[in-house]
Amino acid sequence: GPAYYQQQADYKMDVVLDDKNKRIDGVETITYHNNSPESLEYLWVQLDQNMRARQSKTPLIESQKMEGSVPVDGFVKNYMQQTFDGGFNLVYVNDANGKPLSYVINQTMMRIDLPTPLKPKEKVSFSIKWWYNINNYRVDGGRSGYEEFEKDGNRLYVIAQFFPRMAVYNDVEGWQNMQFWGRGEFALAFGNYDVNITVPADHVLEATGVLLNRKEVFTAEQVKRYELAEKTFDKPVLIVTPDEAKATEKGFSDKTKIWKFRAENVRDFAFSSSRKFIYDAMAVKLETKNVMAISLYPNESNPLWEQYSTKAVAQTLKTYSKHTFDYPYHKAISVSAEDQGMEYPMICWNYGRPDANGYVSDRIKYGMISVIIHEVGHNYFPMIVNSDERQWSWMDEGLDTFLQYLAEQDFMENYPSSRGPAHKIVPYMSGDQKFLEPIMSN
């Protein structure tokens, strides 16, 4: 209605990915716009990495169930011994003049007390410097982290929730400051991002937003290939080839490059980086614009990914745009990351690779295609239609799952979709009531 408002949070960030020490260092300036009719005496900031801090309650909450009796040594091992040294380490929280701000940290949330109330239609800027150790998500779990390739000593990074982020303030509940323990997802405010990411010079990287310095981070030949991809609508064009990726993964450069991105009107920012990446792309024609469909994957993902990933991204954009609204951003990226299925604005992590013998079963093939369609589809819900995932997971999951079915059927005739038609809910609803889970919410 006429009284509707939404807050805005803008970020300027410089981030360093330290591959040798598996660590992120960052400094950010947040400019928070108060578009509400209320004066705000304090701000809530999300510290999602603290779900991995030693005092985190995540191990207790992540456990599916606890038996009636547990041996003492088993309880200590599962619920009290956390070997990974995770969580944000805050170096400073300063105002625009460089003076320290008063703040209190409560697990995964931080309240910053403002020197003077932030009045309606005003904005405030403050800076945070931080670092944290990156988790091996295949060992420690989580929606971001790194995947270790022991045979060649490389890592594939999928980095999200890596910076302190503004919590949502709205006209329904005020501050949405529910804790993040890993299971719930995210409630976020839209804003603009200017992000500089320093990584090893031999890494290939993609992220939310427009890459501002393509000619500085890709070779001249790779830039030409990308320009060709922008005009190619029928099949992906290899920007970084399998042979180039194989050669690069042996290098381990001690030099660095800075990748510069700008993203406008997005609710979050994420990136992926590795020297193992093959990179392909193709153009997708929508009703009002062309969009780039992009995939990043290691050689271990082939031949499956080069054959299907980018085409699945393209089909998702076509089907979802047909049934909802044209995709507003300029690209959508699918990244191969084993044991992942997670979405962020313009970029997502997806599982599915040939088995250890190089065999691709129908289960692996269709599972990979489906998760790509689903996670790319989350760009529409909740990345654009910005629902509160922390409180109401079903809102975006329900819409996305329905549209996923439509995209699967468009992608391939007789696609074996696991969900979609209404009759497929019958076995679930007619099953043992003791095992029916409640609607997805917190």
Residue ranges and their predicted role:
Residues 1-25:
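N-terminal, polar/Ser/Thr-rich
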Residues 23, 33, 39, 70-150, ...:
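A surface-exposed beta-strand-loop module
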Residues 28-30, 34, 47-49, 122-136, ...:
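Short, hydrophobic/aromatic-enriched beta-strand segments in well-ordered soluble domains
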Residues 44-98, 198-203:
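Solvent-exposed beta-hairpin/edge-strand motifs
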Residues 55-70, 131-193, 214:
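Glycine/proline-rich low-complexity spacer/linker segments in large multi-domain proteins
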Residues 164-175, 181-373, 402:
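Hydrophobic helix-coil surface modules that form long, contiguous segments used
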Residues 376-392, 410:
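Catalytic Zn2+-binding segment of zinc metalloproteases
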Residues 397, 401-442:
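Acidic/His/Gly-enriched intrinsically disordered linker/tail segments
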